[in-house]
C-alpha cells in the first residue's frame, strides 16, 4: 500500500482493466454460476453493509432470512418451522461442512465416526474429512452413474453416523436414488444429508417423478444454492435441517455480540446475499423459475441434438441441464476449444468427457457457435 492514495478515477480505471482479464460468461460453458438477476444485484447493493453474524443489529435483514428459509421450506416440503432450522450460507461447501458437523456433534458418543457417500460427491466433503477427522467412505456408482445401493450397504458399520445423497451431481447432473437411501438411513438409524446445491433450484420446476426432499422420512438435512440456478448473487447458499434440534447442534456461545448464540461456520456473514435471494425469489416466483429451467432444458436438448449430428454421444442421457459429451481425447479437445476459440468447458473424471453446464446465460445462438467450433476441433 502506497503512502498516498489514488484518485477515484485511477482506481476505477485499474478495476476496469482487471475486470477485462476475467472470462466473459458468454463463452463459459463449465460454470454452475451465472449472471445474477438485475433485481438480485439491486438488493445486494442496498444491503451491502449488513452483517448477519450480528443479527441483533440488523433485524430487518434477519427477518428477510427467515422469509427465505420459509420459501425454501415450502419448495422442499419441510414440515417443522424451517425458519428455525437453517440459515443462508456462503454456498454448497459451507452447507455440506455444517451438515456433517451437525451429524458429528449429535453423535458425539461415537469416537471414530464415518460417513458413506457416492464417489460422485462434491469435493467439499473431502474438506470435511480434512477438518474433522471423520472418515469418508465412498460408494461406487452404477452404469448410469448413480450411487450403487449395494456398495452403500457394504460400507456401513457401527461407526457410521450418516449417508450423503446427491440430487444433481456436479459432473453429470445425475440424481441418486434418494428414496432408497432414505430407507437405508431409517433402517440403520443414521442421518441422511442431501446435496442439492445444483438440483435444488432445478428439480422442483421440472415435470419429473423424483422425490428427494423432506417428504422422505429419512432425509435430515439439505443443501441448496441460490447463487446457481436461482440467479442470486455470490455468495448465497442455503442449509436446512429436518428438525431444529439438528440445527441447534451447531450452536456456539457469542457473549460479546448483540445475540448470545451463533450457528454459522463463518462469523461475519453477508446480509447482501440474504436480500438478493429474497428479492429474486419473490420477483420470479414459481412461474418465473419454471421458465428459467424450461429454457435451460430446451438449450440442453439443442446441444445434445447438435452433438449427435457430429457423431458425438452423451455419456448418459442428460437428466438436468448438465451434459457430458463422449469425445475421444477429451483433454486435448478441451484445450483446443479454449486456445483456438475461447470456449471454457471442463472435463469429467470417470469417464473422461467434455462437461457442459447450460446455465441461463447460455442461449441457442451460443450453442450454435459452440457446435461449429467443436466440429472444427474434432474433424
From Swiss-Prot:
Keywords: Decarboxylase, Lyase, Pyridoxal phosphate. Its EC number is 4.1.1.11, 4.1.1.25. It comes from the Archaea. Disulfide bonds: none annotated. InterPro entries: GrpII_AminoAcid_Decarb (IPR050477), MfnA (IPR020931), PyrdxlP-dep_de-COase (IPR002129), PyrdxlP-dep_Trfase (IPR015424), PyrdxlP-dep_Trfase_major (IPR015421), PyrdxlP-dep_Trfase_small (IPR015422). The modification N6-(pyridoxal phosphate)lysine is found at residue 228. GO terms for molecular function: aspartate 1-decarboxylase activity; pyridoxal phosphate binding; tyrosine decarboxylase activity. Pathway: Cofactor biosynthesis; methanofuran biosynthesis; Cofactor biosynthesis; coenzyme A biosynthesis. It is an enzyme of class 4 (lyase). It catalyses: L-tyrosine + H(+) = tyramine + CO2; L-aspartate + H(+) = beta-alanine + CO2. Its cofactor is pyridoxal 5'-phosphate. Transmembrane segments: none annotated. Pfam families: Pyridoxal_deC. Belongs to the group II decarboxylase family. MfnA subfamily. Catalyzes the decarboxylation of L-tyrosine to produce tyramine for methanofuran biosynthesis. Can also catalyze the decarboxylation of L-aspartate to produce beta-alanine for coenzyme A (CoA) biosynthesis. NCBIfam families: tyr_de_CO2_Arch. This is Probable L-tyrosine/L-aspartate decarboxylase. It comes from Methanococcoides burtonii (strain DSM 6242 / NBRC 107633 / OCM 468 / ACE-M).
Amino acid at each position: 500500500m502506497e503512502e498516498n492514495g489514488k484518485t477515484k478515477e485511477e482506481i476505477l480505471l485499474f478495476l476496469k482493466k482487471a475486470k477485462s482479464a476475467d472470462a466473459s460468461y458468454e463463452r463459459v460453458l463449465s460454470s454452475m454460476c451465472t449472471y445474477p438477476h438485475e433485481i438480485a444485484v439491486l438488493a445486494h447493493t442496498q444491503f451491502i453493509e449488513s452483517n448477519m453474524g450480528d443479527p441483533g443489529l440488523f433485524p430487518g435483514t434477519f427477518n428477510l432470512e427467515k422469509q427465505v428459509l420459509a420459501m425454501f421450506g415450502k419448495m422442499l416440503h419441510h414440515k417443522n418451522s424451517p425458519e428455525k432450522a437453517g440459515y443462508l450460507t456462503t454456498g454448497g461447501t459451507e452447507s455440506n461442512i455444517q451438515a456433517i458437523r451437525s451429524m458429528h456433534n449429535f453423535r458425539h458418543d461415537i469416537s471414530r465416526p464415518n460417513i458413506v457417500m457416492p464417489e460422485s460427491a462434491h469435493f467439499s466433503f473431502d474438506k470435511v474429512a480434512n477438518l474433522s477427522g471423520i472418515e469418508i467412505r465412498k460408494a461406487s456408482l452404477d452404469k448410469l452413474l448413480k450411487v450403487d445401493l449395494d456398495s452403500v450397504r457394504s460400507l456401513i458399520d457401527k461407526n457410521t453416523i450418516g449417508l450423503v445423497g446427491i440430487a444433481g451431481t456436479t459432473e453429470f447432473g445425475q440424481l441418486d436414488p434418494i428414496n432408497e437411501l432414505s430407507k437405508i438411513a431409517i433402517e440403520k438409524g443414521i442421518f441422511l444429508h442431501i446435496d442439492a446445491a445444483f438440483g435444488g433450484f432445478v428439480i422442483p420446476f421440472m415435470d419429473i417423478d423424483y422425490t428427494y426432499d423432506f417428504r422422505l422420512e429419512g432425509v435430515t438435512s439439505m443443501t441448496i444454492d441460490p447463487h446457481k440456478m436461482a440467479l442470486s448473487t455470490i455468495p448465497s447458499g442455503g442449509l436446512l435441517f429436518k428438525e431444529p434440534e439438528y440445527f441447534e447442534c451447531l450452536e456456539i456461545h457469542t457473549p460479546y455480540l448483540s445475540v448470545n448464540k451463533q450457528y454459522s461456520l463463518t462469523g461475519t456473514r453477508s446480509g447482501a446475499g440474504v436480500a438478493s435471494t429474497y428479492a429474486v425469489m419473490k420477483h420470479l416466483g414459481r412461474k418465473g423459475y419454471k421458465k428459467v429451467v424450461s429454457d435451460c432444458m430446451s438449450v440442453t436438448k439443442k446441444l445434445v441434438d447438435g452433438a449427435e449430428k457430429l457423431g458425438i454421444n452423451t455419456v448418459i442421457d442428460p437428466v438436468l441441464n448438465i451434459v457430458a459429451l463422449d469425445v475421444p481425447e477429451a483433454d486435448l479437445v478441451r484445450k483446443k476449444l479454449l486456445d483456438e476459440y475461447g470456449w471454457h468447458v471442463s472435463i469429467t473424471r470417470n469417464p473422461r468427457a467434455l462437461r457442459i453446464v447450460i446455465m441461463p446465460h447460455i442461449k441457442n445462438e451460443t450453442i450454435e457457435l459452440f457446435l461449429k467450433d467443436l466440429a472444427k476441433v474434432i474433424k
